[in-house]
Amino acid sequence: VIKLNSLQYPNVQNLHISSEYSLSILKNNDEFTKLEDEFKKKYSFSQLITFSFSQSGFLGLLLDLSKKGKIAVSIGESYAIIQAAKQFESLGFELEWIGLQKDGNINIEDVKSLKADFIFISSYIIDTFVKVDLEQVKSLTNAIIISNASANSSKFSDAIYFDTYKLTGFSLSSVLLFDNDLFDEQVIGFKDITAVYSILDALKKQFFVTSQKDIFKDKLIEGFGDDIYFLVDSNQTLEYSLHFALKNIKAREIIRTLALDSIHITNGEGCSLGLSMPSRVIQEMGYEELISRNAISFTFCKEFDIEKIEKVIKILVKRYKQIKVLNEQ
């Protein structure tokens, strides 16, 4: 299998956890404490809690933070956060939004005008993986920055959390790391040890290759010619990701067809979550739904030789042409 969708679909492993990590108020829980300390040390934070990476889970975080100040959310965050933020507003709470520009970057003018005390914004945009300069964001606001660190982490984030499904393939709780008293302390019996163990294990195994993007891009342009276009600048995306679009087809058509060739690609988060929805982020950039269905994202976790890359592109071009012919009939 040639897996080019790892940031959306993880390499799922068997889930194994020792009974040594089970929690009890009648023992010292040394093994869990060591695991927790290892996780906190890895990202230089002092506190760790677990919560549900879902609409209800993020709504809970928003409600907790609303007692302390105003909140802003980047429209380029995960589906679960966006849904939670919309529900938060529907309950009568105020919330500021940071929009996306046509080129996929965050609208920095929205950041400049923020009055928020807390911002949910990550070092990359979901789906396109356009990088976000959190250092610049931090220079423009005193707000606490809370980020998704699943695909990339930044030292300018004041708190980070992880998308368990995309890291492990299991819908376990998420881990949230922070300092001081940003969130309430969590009693040990409520901490999801299976999630802590699994996420840390997945992060240890996480591996990306940065040498493949330019080669794949050149070969794609060579193979597709005028049928390929780019909605975002590939120089502005994570070094191990490539985002592009193919004219006059729906991404799901080529995603499903290539799966039969054991080549796995994706359109974005709506694809990986089983929502059967085209990329929300592309639409938030100002493109119509039809364009968002053209979008395709690659992630590079393995180094391929030039012959292998050319073979993959050849298959991709062949399937694309076949789909176009069938659609024209």
Task: Describe the predicted segments one by one.
Residues 1-4, 10-12, 282-329:
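PLP-dependent enzyme catalytic core of the Aspartate aminotransferase-like
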Residues 1-22, 218-222, 226:
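N-terminal glycine-rich, Lys/His-bearing helix-loop that initiates the first secondary-structure elements
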Residues 35-44, 206-260:
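Conserved PLP-dependent catalytic core of the aminotransferase class-I/II
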Residues 64-82, 96:
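Conserved PLP-anchoring active-site segment centered on the Schiff-base-forming lysine
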Residues 152-201:
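Active-site PLP attachment segment
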